[in-house]
């Protein structure tokens, strides 16, 4: 591999925000500065890159950020990055600002942008930042742990009042295409039913029958965790109440799941991944994605990472069903 001289590193956050992104940014900045490099922050993701919203970052610029949710660099989408012209323009801007290596924090869509920039000569490293846990090359993504805990605490509160009023509660969590958040919340909150986007053919009649059976067994509530990809929570609540006679309410947690101070796990894992991204660039690696598997931090070719498929672990789903007696 030809030696790649890295003097200046850029960092951006792209797509939806996730708690822990600031910890990753902080780690990139301070690791790079500690190794004698310059760091440039790109505001508002690829949109900011194309608009040349590029600033120098110092160690003080990332002080008091590790505990903050969201992203201090802000984030946005830009359709222009899907075009060859947009990709070439972005690569040219990186060269104009002397950005020898670029760390991209985001999900699959963000990685596709990094992949294209790599094709045009920009050394890129991707860090998995998404609350959906839907990146196949890694068992962990920045923000997932915080989002699960945020949702879990909210669902606990709904469960309290659901039990008091002997209600059925449908709680909708995020996850348009992936049901990991719903699955983990379902297990953590002891839900009676989990509806996943991977299982579109769920049987509402079976849910109604199960609610009736649970009431006969003396259960005072019935909790359904519904992933965003299934949706229709409000109408579902009306139908279930009509069929069972049990008061049913729907709660949509929405964007609160993306906010909040990151957990210790998200802070630590994001910090290690951010530092590793800088080290990989200094080793001459490019077009890579950092991941976490089997207790180790590893890196994958970005093309291989994007080609991987990730499904819901059946054993975990089965356990959730077994425990919902």
Language-model features: where?
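Short glycine-rich or small-residue beta-strand-to-loop segments that form or flank ligand, phosphate
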Residues: 8-15, 71-76, 101-104, 169-172, ...
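Short glycine/serine/threonine-rich phosphate/pyrophosphate-binding segments
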Residues: 18-28, 50, 84-85, 101-115, ...
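Short, ordered loop/turn segments at secondary-structure junctions
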Residues: 14-17, 37, 42-47, 77-78, ...
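N-terminal phosphate-binding or glycine-rich loops at protein starts, especially the Walker A/P-loop
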Residues: 2-50
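Accessory alpha-helical/coil subdomains and C-terminal extensions
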Residues: 104-106, 116, 123, 144-247, ...
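Phosphate-binding loop/pocket of nucleotide- and phosphate-handling active sites
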Residues: 244, 288-325
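Glycine-rich oxoanion-binding loops at beta->alpha junctions
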Residues: 2-3, 49-102, 109-110, 142-149, ...
